[in-house]
């Protein structure tokens, strides 16, 4: 619904503002609908795989060790995917309701980053992708929730691997910059259109609809980093030119 603009004075400006707000509401509603459709699809896909392989194993999996191993591997992988998605949805709900809290303490950011890199190193290798991480010997400690920070690293590295193709590289760096500890994750994957860059951290938004994902992971990650007094930025030169995610957190003051 749009209001016809009849004047070029204050009334006209008000008309423009109302029309703009109406457009934003319509866009948000469309994004929510797309989000619900996307999540339904994302839940259905692993459930279908789990059900299919469970039925296969019940029928004749015991007669073939290869079939058994393959089926169990698929079930475990898809179950982990479901678990990650449910956790993202729960976190998103808590943030919306103001019930999301941090359990902060002095933490070693390299330990959490190292765990996240380890989780995806083998996955990347299986997909003929390369993760390059030259871990520094030491960085200042950070005051934060180590589980939530690790969650952010996992989300960002997962995206970098997911939106890359065979032969692509994911380069991870951690360093001190002024009073901050910085982690950058750069991939040589599909990249992001300039018109999408400002929207990728928006709730429900998916820049690439051909890859799996709920569209809320980055919104949750961005909120977690903001709650730590830090920043999460996303840069890309364009489609096919890769993406760089930079996470900056305030270093804990040395006594």
Where are these regions (language model features)?
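Conserved catalytic submotifs in the C-terminal HATPase_c
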Residues: 4-6, 103-108, 125, 130-140
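HAMP signal relay modules and closely related sensory coiled-coil linkers
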Residues: 1-20
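Conserved micro-motifs of the catalytic ATP-binding
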Residues: 97-102, 141-144
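Conserved glycine-rich
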Residues: 229-230, 234
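Short alpha-helical segment of the dimerization/phosphotransfer core of two-component systems
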Residues: 74-82
């Amino acid at each position: 619904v749009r209001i016809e603009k009849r004047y070029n004075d204050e009334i006209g400006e008000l008309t423009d503002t109302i029309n703009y707000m109406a457009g934003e509401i319509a866009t948000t509603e469309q994004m929510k609908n797309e989000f619900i459709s996307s999540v339904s699809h994302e839940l259905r896909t692993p459930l279908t795989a789990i059900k299919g392989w469970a039925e296969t194993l019940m029928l004749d999996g015991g007669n073939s060790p290869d079939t058994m191993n393959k089926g169990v591997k698929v079930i475990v992988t898809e179950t982990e995917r479901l678990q990650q998605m449910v956790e993202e949805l729960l976190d998103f709900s808590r943030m919306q309701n103001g019930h999301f809290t941090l359990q902060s303490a002095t933490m070693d950011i390299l330990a959490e980053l190292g765990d996240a890199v380890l989780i995806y190193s083998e996955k990347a290798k299986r997909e003929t992708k390369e993760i390059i991480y030259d871990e520094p010997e030491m960085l200042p400690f950070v005051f934060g929730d180590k589980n939530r920070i690790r969650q952010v690293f996992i989300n960002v590295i997962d995206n970098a691997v997911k939106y890359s193709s065979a032969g692509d590289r994911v380069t991870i760096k951690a360093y001190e910059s002024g009073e901050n500890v910085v982690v950058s994750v750069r991939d040589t994957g599909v990249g992001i259109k300039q018109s999408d860059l400002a929207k990728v951290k928006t709730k429900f938004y998916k820049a690439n609809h051909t890859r799996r994902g709920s569209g809320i992971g980055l919104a949750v990650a961005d909120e977690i980093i903001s709650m730590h007094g830090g920043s999460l930025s996303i840069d890309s030169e364009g489609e096919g030119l890769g993406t760089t995610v930079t996470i900056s957190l305030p270093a804990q003051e040395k006594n």
